[in-house]
Amino acid sequence: MELSEAEVQVLASLEKARVESKDTDRHLLEAEADRFWIFLEDWSDAYFSLQKKGLIEGDQKGYRLTESGHPLAQQYHHQRPDMYWYYYQRFYQAARASAAHSELCRQVFGKDLCQEGQTDMAALDDLLELLDLKPGEEVLDLGCGAGVIAEHISDQKDVSITGLDYADPAIAEAVERTKAKRSKLKFLQGDMNALDLPENSIDAVISLDTLYWVSNLEKTLSMLMIAMRPGGRMGIFMNHHIADGDDQSELAPESTDLSKALTNLGVSFTTRDFTVQIGDFWRKNWKAAADLKQRFESEGNGFIAESLIREAEEDYLPDINSGKIARYLYYVQC
């Protein structure tokens, strides 16, 4: 069945409301639609068309998914919970051709590897020093994006890397760009919540701010551990936020969800504190995006700068300035 993107967003929103046990009147549904940001479609005609297709029922006071609509709604809610699915559909191709993004990467990360994350070159070097990769080892890059960082690591350390990402455009970009390096680089579209990795096949795992999208940390970590060879290790960067009123102790390294999951699994790990560095990173990222905004817009890539500025101003700088964020590098020995 062919659906418009507006219809897809309505179905995903109804499923979100169902999962969260929230009311589904039209006003409340649309009040939460700002999570789609600039990618929000006009839903005006979508309710009626979805009813005609037999996928929803009800009226403005409350819509419900039909038996036919529920499986589709589950699929779209999983795939497109917020703006990021839409963002990544556009980002990789745009960034590859963007001189403004190349300049931002040089200013913020210290080198242009077409980055879209929070790990600059100094932090990446710290992670690689801990992992101590040996020539010929097999490495898994979780959430590899377009694979430029994976390619850089493979070239520098003479290792083979498999990159995994849920975004089809990212994997397509990575595969096309690295055709000549197929013996060392492989890229797969996949879901970190449903890993299917051969036992004893991996020497090291790299995760640069990707485990936020895992629904069950212990389950995913267990699947990774099964795939690890003896002496395997993981390098994981993650941020941790607390809300207003939460105790500051919840930001301690031993109190994070990742630390608790690793402890429950009986895994040996250490942490390095990168909280100061993440503050410096986001201030630099915000300034570079603002300074380069007109260049991005002149390329037709204004959404990249707008997204970085929005993230900095809404998601990061307030928590950084009020001490409600911590960042750690986890070194895990399996």
Question: How does the language model describe each region?
Answer:
Residues R233-D257:
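Conserved class I S-adenosyl-L-methionine
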Residues G117-P135:
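Conserved alpha-helix/loop element of class I SAM-dependent methyltransferases that forms part
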Residues D59, Y63-Q107:
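N-terminal, positively charged/glycine-rich alpha-helical extensions of SAM-dependent methyltransferases
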Residues E218-R233:
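A short glycine-rich, Lys/Arg-flanked "PGG" loop and its adjoining helix->strand segment in the class I
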Residues E138-L142, A146-A194:
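Class I SAM-dependent methyltransferase SAM/SAH-binding core
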Residues N193-V205:
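A short acidic, Gly/Pro-enriched loop at the edge of an enzyme's catalytic core
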